[in-house]
Amino acid sequence: MKGGEGLLKETVYIATLLHDIGKFIELSKGYAVDKKFKDIKVGHPKYSAQFLETLSKENSFFKNCGQELTELLLHHYEPRNDLERIIQLADWLSSSEREKGETKEKYFTIPLAPIFSRLFDGQDKKYGYALAPLSISEGFPKEDISLTTAQYKNQVDSFLKELSAIKNTTQLYYLLEKYLWCVPAQTTNYISDVSLFDHAKNTAAIALCLYDEYSAGSLTSEDLNKMTDNADN
């Protein structure tokens, strides 16, 4: 996906939508990572990059995205250039809405929590969303939900099967919504009330804004370096 400003912007958009897809795949515990990614320190970008390489062999949409998309997915945690820093910064800004919390259960068993579950003091019941493709019947929380790797494996397999047939970014967006609406973006040491889909779309929106500022010259390489260096401070 090279040769024009619009195509490069679309590459950043797709990469940001998919930047955490490796978390979803890793939760299934059903896919191994190739040894060639061993030098990448953080786990889920390896899954993201490997999944994209596999799709590129089967699907012309992902094949046309080129190697640059794989590189953006693989290195957004340890950026080497400005585009990777844009995605890293967008990710950090999008993640700043999460509330910290205690986690006693295994991280892959914790469901997405409904945002209304903490409105009332003294509420001892715990509610969560089951893993299932988005539908009217599944869009309601249930009491005492605990997820399993087998459930994640079924969800991932169904997602990948449909993903292999997509032809454009619009289809990609709505397919991500269909399968990631019920997947928590983070469960370890944070309250799990933000879905992986909501985090992905918010991060993509921020990344596009940063990219436009960068393309217009209002955001420089020096600015990106300063902001990513100070993002945790």
Q: What are these regions, as identified by a protein language model?
A:
Residues K9, A204-A216, A231-N233:
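Catalytic cores of nucleotide-enabled group-transfer and carboxylate-activating enzymes in metabolic
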Residues L27, S215-T220:
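Short, solvent-exposed secondary-structure capping/transition elements
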